[in-house]
Amino acid sequence: MESTVDGLTIRRPRYNVSAESASGYRREAGVREEKKPRQRDAGFGAAVPVLLLLYVLSVRGLVHISLRQLVTPGGHSTGFNASTAREYLQQITSIDSRTAGSPENEIIAVNYLLGKIKDIEEKINSVHRITVDVQRPTGTFSIDFLGGFTSYYDNITNIAVKLEPEHRAEHAVLANCHFDTVANTPGASDDAVSCAVMLEILGSLSSSSKPLKHAIIFLFNGAEENILQGSHGFITQHPWAKMVRAFINLEAAGVGGKELVFQTGPENPWLVQAYASAAVHPFASVVAQEVFQSGIIPSDTDFRIYRDFGNIPGIDLAFIENGYIYHTKYDTWDRILTESIQRAGDNILGVLHYLATSSQLAESSQFRHGNMVFFDVCGLFVLSYPARLGTIINYITAAVTLFYISKKMIKYKQGGTNYVRDLVYGLIITLVSWVSALVTVLIIAVLVSLAGKALSWYTHFYVSIFLYGSAAVAKFILVHSLAKTYFFAGASSQYLGDLFFDISLITWCIPLVLLTQSGLCSAYFFAAWIIFPLLTKLLLQPDIIHQGSPYKFTAVYLLGLFPPYLHTMYHVWAVFEMFTPILGRSGTEIPPDIVLGFLIIACTIILITYFISFIYLLKSTKKIIVTLAVLSVLTLLLVCSGMFFPYSSSNDSPKPKRIFLQHTTRTFHSLTGEVVKRDSGIWINGFDYTGISYVTPHIPELNETVRAPCDDAPLCGFPWYFPVHHLIRKNWYLPAPPAPINEHTDFKLVSREEMSWGATRLFFEVKGPSHMTVYVRPNTNTVLSSWSLGDGIPVASGETDYFIFYSHGLYAPAWKFWIELKNSAKESKGIVTVAVGSHYFFGDSRNSPDLETLELKFPDWSFPSSWVCTYDLYEY
């Protein structure tokens, strides 16, 4: 058939719709056709989209309220006093940056903690006993974090406090925090507040007249920021480690807010049940657990160490709000609300007491098997059930959906309507709308990135909603509106509304089955999106569906969507609260606008799927499409004009740009030991996609002419502190005189031994600052077969290089290690290149006049973290 629109002739497909589907009511075979009821073919009015918008905003408001639950300090009978914990927090952070190995960390912070523990011990109730042990372990291990590297530590500091019944205990639960910080930061949220909470919990429990059944070990670990060294030292070497049956790890990926349970287990479902029973203000998600364990978040915690090296199950909690100032100078005690401390203290105290008085702790091996589906409901309570039960529920849900769809197929077939064809076409149209919206958003993201305006939403998150969210929704509506006009012409609005409701069921049934089949507990998420809407549809009275007021129908329909919609919006908040700040420190190679565009598309698809049927019920969608398109285009123009600056120096809510400044002296030695190259300068790394484009106007000498070259040397010839060179490929090297260093690193080959099995073993000795990194690159035809580190099997950090992270406490002897290489051919140029990076984070050598001068030039919306380092390369 043909129609004329604005002078254009449009040929529509020959698509015959039965009279039954056109009129919008059904007639079963063999049943007398009833009088045609009043239809809604005229379509819903313009007020319905407004109602949908108000619905979305109302749900978002409820989520906001649930996340801002105020907890009055001392207002609960848990026994936890947030005011006391806050005093501890303030005093701990008054100690300067507590880098492992520094006097601030190894002496001042340790003495402070020991003093407070002694004060608590003096007030202990006679039913308890406290034992304190200061551990200074030495050890080594390999980890596959950040591409894989090996760690070695010497004489670091842990403080372990055991609270147990008067007559001792055989089993224990471990509570872990760390009091060290990354360089140049006060580390209030990461992780001083957790240590303050643990001190107050220790005081509360030890003064209680209620005896414990099991011991609680409070571990204040002093080297977590050295990539989990402190926890490894405890769990592999401390005699109390054998007592531990479960642990709670307290961490941070943000500053303040609610602490999220984002990892549990492995297996041991009784731990989830313990949290669900004892946490006063729960905040937990199995979805967060499976996202974190997928590795897409570039972070790790002590949970991994206790799980992998101690074979102990546990609970991992972290503050996730305001990650913009995580690991910056803005992570100060005054930014953490007392209510946040109270909430965390109530939860952790409750769970620790529950575990320490539970019979399950001693017999945990009997309850080991199986995973749990768990999630909190707006912070009110935790809903949890065994994963095997979840599997049954999921498959039953899928089967009921299949039965429902099959029944409709039979009914429509008897009535002469080709429902199966419509269903297939509808699924294709839905997929086309998804792909079309994704392509549109990616095109916009690429344009923004090419225009040099990436991260424009970093400080103004609403910009991303207007820019990408509006475009996505407009494209969804446009595709379905075109399908309604030119593909489903002649079909009744009620029939199409029902059809796309069924398509929504099928849409979520597919991931439900796939995730369940993969053993992922997150599948419950999609089960909820099927169960509640389907139940509502089945319970709706036919007169409401076919004859009732559009607003009555809409209200009842939205009421059925409310549980999954609220739960999804709750998770959507968590996704953007976590990932938006991460995109400001994810390196120079990942376009953040493209990643955010993907996230917005994914969340929009989930939130809008059950609204698609309204497109087919509305009289017109033209104004909605135009409004959304104009909003997106206008936002794009404002973004490209530079209207929205990415960073902020606001005192209330700073969102700084992160930059590393390393005053570096590089020395390259030949095979004979001669110095073949030496230079010095300030090596600059920006941790986000914008590089230094926003910094150059403030520091003209810092431009593309001083881009750092990638030398043919391990890790491009620069002293990387962590193996993140694959994430940050753009860096700058501003020439400067050598930094004054009081004590240079002494790196030497002690001996060389030819082994009977044809390998060459090189013995090294290193004496230097508390933090050093060694990079090993075997030459052509040479294989690094073993070494004296980790488990003896070398772990590569890339295709050719091996990364070793070394740290020591206040004092340590020279570090000795060996590597073994096998060479298949005689090489005149040697068999291996070894380089050592030395990092001076504290003391007289940590700064230089040139570094101070450059740092002062950086704008106030940036956070330059600076230190002095050296890079020495040797060939053997």
Curated annotation (Swiss-Prot):
Residue numbers on the Cytoplasmic membrane side: 1-42, 405-427, 484-494, 541-555, 615-623
Q: EC?
A: 3.4.-.-
Kindly report the protein's main subcellular placement as a broad class. endoplasmic reticulum
Any idea which GO molecular function terms this record carries? metal ion binding; metalloexopeptidase activity
Instruction: Determine if Ion transport is one of this entry's keywords.
Output: no
Q: Which cofactor does it need?
A: Zn(2+)
Q: Name one GO cellular component term.
A: endoplasmic reticulum membrane
- The active-site annotation reads 224
Cysteine-cysteine disulfides: 177-195
Instruction: Please tell me where Zn(2+) 2 binds in this chain.
Output: 190, 225, 327
* Residues holding Zn(2+) 1: 178, 190, 251
Q: Name one GO biological process term.
A: proteolysis
Q: What class of enzyme is it?
A: hydrolase
- Family indicated by similarity: Belongs to the peptidase M28 family.
Q: Which PANTHER family match?
A: ENDOPLASMIC RETICULUM METALLOPEPTIDASE 1 (PTHR12147:SF22), METALLOPEPTIDASE M28 FAMILY MEMBER (PTHR12147)
The identity of this protein, by name, is Endoplasmic reticulum metallopeptidase 1
Species of provenance:
Xenopus laevis
The gene coding this protein: ermp1
